[in-house]
Amino acid sequence: MIGWDGAPITLGGRVVLRDIVLRAGAGELVCLCGPNGAGKSTLLRAMAGMLPGSPRQDPRRIAWLPQGARCAWGLTVAEVAALGRIPHGDASAAPVERALVACGLEGLRDARVDRISGGQARRAMLARAFATDPEVFLLDEPTADLDPAAAHAIMALLRATAAAGRCVVVVVHALDLALHHATRLVVLADGRITADAPPAEALAAAAAAFGLPFGCDPTPRLLPPRA
């Protein structure tokens, strides 16, 4: 279980999030959606204990992947994934291998991350989070800059991870991905939660937050049926 208890979140002397009460538990894939500046990343950082005054979190229990996280050039894919074991103080091979397989990188374990595609490098960072073997994943836009097929594959992996008993909270800017994969959709606008419900029930609030025309259907048309 992880969440936020309603305390206002202030940055630079300005309240950017207020009246936020959110709880996410095992088995859930919670997608945070909303327009730019809505406070999605700020809320996730607060939940991860990365903001001044926010409760510190145990890095063995929570895997945090910030927006735009980059691999260290010169490392191999396996070495990047192994960084996820640092909070545990060990270099156990088994969790790293499971992470590589889960992220579809077992064939690239010895490849340098500066010699693979951007999408593969992003998956290497995700493998780092998986190698931590956490109870909770807090991921800020892990599908950014990926092609639709790769983004769908990562979201399907995260949904399966949640179904296996982990808690996954993810910022997703592509509304169609969130509607297709989330078990809960949390919509933020102007620093407040405007909806927190299963995707079908939160659709109207999500469309309003993104400024979509009334009656517009943003549901996915090109993604395969969810397993």
What positions do the PLM features span?
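H-loop/switch region of ABC-family ATPase nucleotide-binding domains
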Residues: 172-173
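Conserved ABC ATPase signature
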Residues: 112-116
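The feature captures the beta-strand-to-loop junction immediately N-terminal to the Walker
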Residues: 33-35
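ABC ATPase C-loop
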Residues: 129-130
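Catalytic Walker B motif of ABC-type/P-loop ATPase nucleotide-binding domains
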Residues: 137-141
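Helix-to-loop junction immediately C-terminal to a conserved catalytic motif
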Residues: 48
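ABC ATPase nucleotide-binding domains
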Residues: 207-227
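Conserved ABC ATPase "signature" region
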Residues: 93-108
